[in-house]
Amino acid sequence: MNRRTRFITSVALIVLSVGMGVDGARGQTPTPSFALVGHLEQLDVKDLNDPLSAGSMVVNGTRITLPRNLLIKMPGQYLTVNDLFRGKLPGKAPALAVASKPSGLALADLPPHKPPVPFEVEVIGNIIGTEYIAGWMSIAQLGLHTGAGFIQSIDYATGALIVGPEGGSSMSKVRINDPRGTYGKPNPSKGVGSKMDDRFAADPGNAPIVSQTGFPMCIPLSAAGDSNCPLTNRGTGGNEKRFTCGPVSVDPTAPARPACLPGKKAPLREGDYITYSGMLTEETPGAGNFFIAAHAISSLTGIYTSPGADPAYVLIEEAIIGTLGAPFPPPNDNQEQTSRFVFVGFTTDPTRR
């Protein structure tokens, strides 16, 4: 975005009067902001009994106040500071785990709670007086932690994708971090469920396990498929990569598959090229063998839906929304404001306008 700077020349009018002096106008000092990215060194909560409690953390040696009611962006959900202290298996309402210290996320946490891999924090806020106060923050093991490769095989018993080069040796083991079983086996049924951290799970509502068009995908419970992840949703050949899920083709290059049900997910299959994001998780504590607990998987497949048929899906890669806002009064008018917006994404039904 082009930045413009306007220089304003001010003319000072000096008024002399008996017994009175007028000072020159002074601009108000703006509140300084900050943005930090670094490892989570310390994390604390003020009141374990308050689900919306305030807290504090240390990042890059800087102590930051986490105000009450702050929602923290995780890979697939939003949590409060108090939620971070419910452990790897926080449960769900009304049977939530009791919050207790430490969180197991900070480098200062002592064994056996010390994380084997440090967590990364992004935080933005304001400096009020002598205090850094967070306004937005996110936690991930690594913000840009991604991998890619071909699905060489699928271990249905443990819900694991074995990923590597096509025709080459196996290199990565990827499991969906899925406590509820939205995209396949729930974590407790995978044999390593207690080792996954539900705080970093995949979003169960807005599907992050998708084709390139945004069609939701899954790992079947068995090689025969299941009712929520039927094999027929990959076309007649069982591993088609570009087709229309429905009776009417959306494009000649994406043939219609009437048996495909757009309200169901499409199974990931051997031979699919995928990219994935997640966190390194020890399969056997202390043994140094890791797998990826994925919160997002994107398959290089083009699965569409019939024109005008519901449901249709949208995948948004980037959204820039201008909020306009009230203009600053002079002389503080160096403001870039716009009401325009930009979306970059894909849809299963490009005929819709």
Task: Walk through the language-model features, giving the residues of each.
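Bacterial N-terminal signal peptides that target proteins for export
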Residues: 1-11
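Bacterial N-terminal signal peptides
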Residues: 10-19
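Short, flexible, surface-exposed loop segments at domain boundaries
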Residues: 25-353
